[in-house]
């Protein structure tokens, strides 16, 4: 049914009362008075809902850790209506068949809209599924992925021809092998995967003749080059001096406090392009003993709420959060989300800046919600709208899984 959503929308860099009409899940008009039409009033400050371009929801193959139902439910509770899932499953998503099998398992289970990456090995661009939202390259080994040592020029040309964005796990394998050692705490893990491995990867990625490339989860402000830079809340807010144990073990590692604080300063100064969660859950057994614990931190539900608390404290400008967590991520992939604009999906989140809470891991919706952010200040959205449908109402989930698969080029086809 056509209707207008009415409230104080974040529009052109400020909050203003607007009546936003929606037809078939898409914004049709933006007015002060929408006229004779059914209205739904949204409380608080109304922002476009967010996009997280970097999650690991573990479907298929490791659903004891997470599945798309629990992962996507966590996403919408955190104000995120589109997630992009990584390809490092037990059976890596390297070709059409693996991609189709994964999509078949996920369809009908996701609460948020979703897109899927394929893994780039340096020689497989001809056989990856054309619906892949992008390609992921692991320059250094990580969970379920060996390091890809190089992308030949001919492969880069093919990637450009197919129009793929490439996102890099930016730790160079040769450097990681050089520094490999036993680690029994966060400090030792940091030293075993030092910043120099990211710097080496940055030099390589910057040299590649790729039209669209992203360096994932940058952990130090010195890591820069001819690419977009993604940053995560855990590298912004946590460091290796905190008593987090294996819950804080992640790749790239949490850095020392000085590096973490400089990274946060760079982010709040507007020096980064993308804010993602790198949501990567593991079982209690996987995290039991630090030396053998698997790397990964959950964060899809807390990514935006943690940053909203920084906005309230006047540490972070809302516009920086808006650009990095909401507007820019979908725009990189040609997806019409993240703006209050005609022709964009009607995805909104309502924020009550007076309702700040402590993160309580027992109330998170991930399958195994042990969070390194437990006890930190956060502001969760009270209401979330996805394509004109209210999916979170007064902090409660009220919808069935309505998530839609978003293949590469989907929004081009709708023009």
Swiss-Prot record:
Its cofactor is Zn(2+). The active site is at residue 278. One of its GO terms (molecular function) is dihydroorotase activity. It is an enzyme of class 3 (hydrolase). Pathway: Pyrimidine metabolism; UMP biosynthesis via de novo pathway; (S)-dihydroorotate from bicarbonate: step 3/3. GO terms for cellular component: cytoplasm. The modification N6-carboxylysine is found at residue 136. One of its GO terms (biological process) is 'de novo' UMP biosynthetic process. Keywords: Hydrolase, Metal-binding, Pyrimidine biosynthesis, Zinc. It comes from the Archaea. Binds 2 Zn(2+) ions per subunit. The keyword Zinc applies. It catalyses: (S)-dihydroorotate + H2O = N-carbamoyl-L-aspartate + H(+). Coiled coil: none annotated. Catalyzes the reversible cyclization of carbamoyl aspartate to dihydroorotate. Belongs to the metallo-dependent hydrolases superfamily. DHOase family. Class I DHOase subfamily. This is Dihydroorotase. It comes from Thermoplasma volcanium (strain ATCC 51530 / DSM 4299 / JCM 9571 / NBRC 15438 / GSS1). The lineage of its organism: Archaea, Methanobacteriati, Thermoplasmatota, Thermoplasmata, Thermoplasmatales.
